[in-house]
Swiss-Prot record:
PANTHER family: AFG3 LIKE MATRIX AAA PEPTIDASE SUBUNIT 2, ISOFORM A, ATP-DEPENDENT PROTEASE. ATP hydrolysis is coordinated within m-AAA protease ring complexes: ATP-binding to YTA10/AFG3 inhibits ATP hydrolysis by the neighboring subunit YTA12/RCA1, leading to coordinated ATP hydrolysis within the AAA ATPase ring. PROSITE patterns: AAA. It is a multi-pass membrane protein. The keyword Signal does not apply. Zn(2+) binds at H558, H562, D634. Changing R447 to G/K: Suppressor mutation; able to complement a mutation in the Walker B motif of YTA12. The active site is at E559. The lineage of its organism: Eukaryota, Fungi, Dikarya, Ascomycota, Saccharomycotina. SMART domains: AAA (SM00382). Present with 3870 molecules/cell in log phase SD medium. Its cofactor is Zn(2+). ATP binds at V290, A291, T332, G333, K334, T335, L336, H472. This is Mitochondrial inner membrane m-AAA protease component YTA10. It comes from Saccharomyces cerevisiae (strain ATCC 204508 / S288c).
Length: 761
């Protein structure tokens, strides 16, 4: 910084040579620009001055460049003097000097660049035009060809009889032609009528007879630039549009092969914005990084193998599938599979989002689809991946434009259908797509010949979660005690996270690393993983949210009711932890259960889950004179389960084997059943919930002392684990149905459980 300041202080002497003349030259040009002489005379004068000053100005610029370059080269590097004791110091001094030379060299190159010349040209041009069109004040010098005052005109010329003719130009400028010399003097007036009266008065005082008085002629004279004024807004607008277009079109393309920055070109809105990936790009993800979805990975790998070695399949008469659609819940790895395909394939891979086809301009979506497939065919064999295809692939005729108006989304979908399976279809272009909602896609898009394979990627089971954990644990700095048995660690974490997707697992691993760093721990331990899992499931601990004693006691008995019900119900999920620490958005307490990976739920399981959900409210009813609003989420879950049992699962004798599911995603104005049936459904739902409430009340009434024990322990510790529950209540009277839980979390389960209290349904 000091070096730059020292050089900058030495520069002004050279920089002054950039001016276009000293004070004497400025005083020569300025009166010419501001004078009221005829325009052609001003232009001739300016032309002469420009001719005389051109050589001088170019010489000054060249001398500035030479002096500035010498200053850069000869200026000593103060930081590098006297530091020759080591190679490291010498190298750093050389690099500093090189950086300074590059910095000043770029400055001198800028002054010689075309951009600087254009800027100076525009500045000088606008200055000249503004000066020519702007009235100016009086100037010193000879009276000819300059602006006078009316008093000067009267005393110097009119009273002496030196004026032969007077011209009133444009009703505000008076030009007086002198006798014999043909010179012209001028002055401005405010009103023509007042000027004529003043002329008559002066000539009356001079006793000039009417026949000898000076004739006054009125003329209209336009400036060479006056005709531009009506077109000036249009010129500025077109010039601005041209400048913006040049800037946008000249922006460099993306590194991944996409369009340029900004709008991607004002006249290129119909171009595809797909990004190109190949083996030269920075995509480092391969199929080794994908775990937990082996079947889907095998399906996608076949596309890559076919493009790499088509002869293996063609000799058997097989053809490559035209496309595959990946569907499943968010976070299950659909986009990750596409990235792995881009990293493994030796063919061009074009990636685009479905929303990039949707624009405000009509026809842009279809144009981009055509351009995308044209680009893919030019690089065939190639792969196209369209993420979130439901943005353009929704079923036609639903949710479209009203009144039969043109729907841009449908036009885009029609073009996509034609490109995938039409007259110009290429067998060498494979289309992959991802969506979270395959149920809303158009049937024509999902048929064989377009998307031949429908690959469903569900949330991973315990084995899939274990494989995903093994992938993510490799990059973490774990406690040496944990690295000795990675299979056991990954299995335990997989058991602790039922229902987690690949994205949830990656988030939990990252949260564990962040928690360890927050506590300045050198390694990540199992305690950090447990805290991270709780953070992902229940939210952040709200330690600053202080509850009153009554609120805390109410929350403790509420959670104790849930825990005791779950402990003594056969089909309840294994309890892992109960806490009354506020978490997340409004949650004052929570209980963590570990449900097994199951795909069928019996009627008895539904009823036991409803009993456990009502345990919090029933515990409040048994221990407090008034209940609280803490059970509103429990009621919501109970109502949903009871309603599903009656309307869609056939678990109600009065409704029978009928389905009235209202959650099919389609809006219906009229219900598919009568009012009488609706009343019957309401009564059946209420009956199931009442039965669950009655059974829960009987169960907790028989175990009031156990509820008190758990609640007091919660008030003392704020969080209790499964070991605390065993210490307080004894082992569960039922064998756990979760095999992974017994293997990784409860290896010493009791083989002879005690008799369980009865729970009527």
């Amino acid at each position: 910084m000091m070096m730059w300041q020292r050089y900058a202080r030495g520069a002004p002497r050279s920089l002054t040579s950039l001016s276009f003349g000293k004070a004497s030259r400025i005083s020569t040009v300025k009166p010419v620009l501001r004078s009221r002489m005829p325009v052609h005379q001003r232009l001739q004068t300016l032309s002469g001055l420009a001719t005389r000053n051109t050589i001088h100005r170019s010489t000054q610029i060249r001398s500035f460049h030479i002096s500035w370059t010498r200053l850069n080269e000869n200026r000593p590097n103060k930081e590098g003097e006297g530091k020759n004791n080591g190679n490291k110091d010498n190298n750093s001094n050389k690099e500093d000097g090189k950086d300074k030379r590059n910095e000043f060299g770029s400055l001198s190159e800028y002054f010689r660049s075309k951009e600087f010349a254009n800027t100076m040209f525009l500045t000088i041009g606008f200055t000249i035009i503004f000066t020519l069109l702007t009235p100016s004040s009086n100037n010193s010098g000879d009276d000819s060809n300059r602006v006078l005052t009316f008093q000067d005109f009267k005393t110097k010329y009119l009273e002496k009889g030196l004026v032969s003719k007077i011209y009133v130009v444009n009703k505000f400028l008076v030009e007086a032609e002198l006798v014999n010399t043909k010179q012209v003097v001028s002055f401005t007036i405010g009103s023509v009528d007042i000027f004529e009266e003043q002329m008559d008065q002066i000539q009356d005082l001079l006793n000039i007879p009417p026949r000898d008085r000076i004739p006054i002629k009125y003329i209209e004279r336009s400036s060479p630039f006056t005709f531009l004024f009506p077109f000036l807004p249009t010129i500025i607008l077109l010039g601005g549009l041209y400048f913006i277009t040049r800037k946008i079109n000249s922006s460099p393309p993306n590194a991944n092969g996409g369009g340029g920055g900004g709008l991607g070109g004002m006249f290129n809105v119909g171009k595809s914005r797909a990004k190109l990936f190949n083996k030269e790009t920075d995509i480092k993800i391969s199929f080794k990084n994908v775990a937990g979805c082996d079947e889907a990975k095998q399906e996608i790998m076949e596309f890559v193998h076919f493009l790499k070695n088509p002869g293996k399949y063609t000799k058997l008469g097989a053809k490559i599938p035209r496309g595959a659609i990946l569907s499943g819940p968010p976070g299950t790895g659909k986009t990750l599979l596409a990235k792995a395909t881009a990293g493994e394939a030796n063919v061009p891979f074009l990636s685009v989002s479905g929303s990039e086809f949707v624009e405000m301009f009509v026809g842009v979506g279809a144009s981009r689809v055509r351009d995308l497939f044209t680009q893919a065919r030019s690089m065939a064999p190639s792969i196209i991946f369209i993420d979130e295809i439901d943005a353009i692939g929704k079923e036609r005729g639903k949710g479209g434009a009203l009144g039969g108006a043109n729907d841009e989304r449908e036009a885009t979908l029609n073009q996509l259908l034609v490109e995938m399976d039409g007259f110009t279809t290429s067998d060498q272009v494979v289309v992959l797509a991802g969506t979270n909602r395959p149920d809303v896609l158009d049937n024509a898009l999902m048929r064989p010949g377009r998307f031949d394979r429908h690959i469903q990627i569900d949330s991973p089971d315990v084995n899939g979660r274990q494989q995903i954990y093994l992938v993510h644990l490799k990059r973490l700095n774990l406690d040496p005690l944990l690295t000795d048995d990675m299979n056991n660690l990954s299995g335990k974490l997989a058991t602790l996270t039922p229902g987690f997707t690949g994205a949830d697992i990656a988030n939990a691993c990252n949260e564990a690393a962040l928690i360890a760093a927050r506590h300045n721990d050198p390694y990540i331990t199992i305690h950090h993983f447990e805290q991270a899992i709780e953070r992902v499931i229940a939210g952040l601990e709200k330690k600053t949210r202080v509850l009153s004693k009554e609120e805390k006691r109410s929350v403790a008995y509420h959670e104790a009711g849930h825990a005791v019900c779950g402990w003594f119900l056969k089909y309840a999920d294994p309890l892992l932890k109960v806490s009354i620490i506020p978490r997340g958005q409004g949650a004052l307490g929570y209980a963590q259960y570990l449900p097994p990976d199951q795909y069928l739920i019996s009627e008895e399981q539904f009823r036991h889950r409803m009993i456990m959900a009502l345990g919090g409210r029933v515990s409040e009813e048994l221990h407090f004179p008034s209940v609280t609003s803490g059970a509103h989420d429990d009621f919501k879950k109970v109502t949903q389960m009871a309603n599903a049992m009656v309307t869609s699962l056939g678990m109600s004798p009065k409704i029978g084997y009928l389905s009235f599911d209202q959650n099919d995603g389609n809006f219906k104005v009229n219900k598919p059943f009568s009012n009488k049936t609706a009343r019957t459904i309401d009564l059946e739902v209420k009956s199931i919930v009442d039965d669950a409430h009655r059974a829960c009340t009987e169960l907790l009434t028989k175990n009031l002392d156990k509820v008190d024990l758990v609640a007091k322990e919660l008030l003392r510790k704020e969080a209790i684990t499964r070991e605390d529950m065993i210490r307080l209540l004894g082992p569960r009277p039922f064998k756990e149905r979760n095999e992974a839980f017994e293997k990784y979390l409860d290896p010493k389960s009791n083989t002879e459980p005690p008799e369980a209290p009865a729970a009527t349904n």
